Amino acid sequence: MPSYTLNYFNHRGRAEICRMLFAAAGVQYNDRRIETSEWSNMRSKMPCSMMPMLDIDNRHQIPQTMAIARYLAREFGFHGKNNMEMARVEYISDCFYDILDDYLRMYQDDNCRMMFQRSGDRNGSSEKRTRYQETLRRILPFMERTLEMYKSGGQFFMGDQMTMADMMCYCALENPIMEESSLLNSYPKLQALRTRVMSHLKMSPYLKKRSSTEF
């Protein structure tokens, strides 16, 4: 088994999908959490000067959230059973990542650095908030229909097997739902899916014991 180290800030943020994949697979890894105060000295050492970054056996470094997530999903069997399923898992995951990305951008400073705190103005810049809300309106109805189309009577996007797509539905919507608890009231299928992910045999213990962070 390879040795994995996942590098990210001490937040869920863009790394949580990777942590969920490790948890679902029951694979041990080093969850290296970088304090914001340490980041300026480490930034130049990271590929693309960004995190998350996955280190494999101290030989290979993979930056970019979804590149890491796809790699882990393929390695651990959460990427679909054939090429068509894999394509579906990927576009569903990318749709949810669009929501996550637009949400987190509302809490970046003028230099595109995450603040990891909510100011008194909860809404952030009106332009970024508008973009985020448009992304929700564009994606959530489509995902609700997609879930009904593909699940084939099963519990998840690809039937009876949980994939990266289901985990992305859970983690990408965590912060938005914390801010707006009624977000999925018009999307009961997505709401029920998130409950099933939360209750998954491997996922439930992880979600209960993980560190509590604001983002």
From Swiss-Prot:
One function term, GO molecular function aspect: glutathione transferase activity
Origin: domain of life: Eukaryota
Record bears the keyword NADP: no
Keywords: Eye lens protein
Tissue-by-tissue expression: Lens.
GST N-terminal domain: residues covered: 2-80
Residue intervals of the GST C-terminal domain: 82-215
Gene3D superfamilies xref list: 1.20.1050.10, Glutaredoxin
GO BP annotations, alphabetical order: glutathione metabolic process
Family indicated by similarity: Belongs to the GST superfamily.
Role according to the record: S-crystallins are structural components of squids and octopi eye lens. Contains relatively little if any GST activity.
Protein name as catalogued: S-crystallin 2
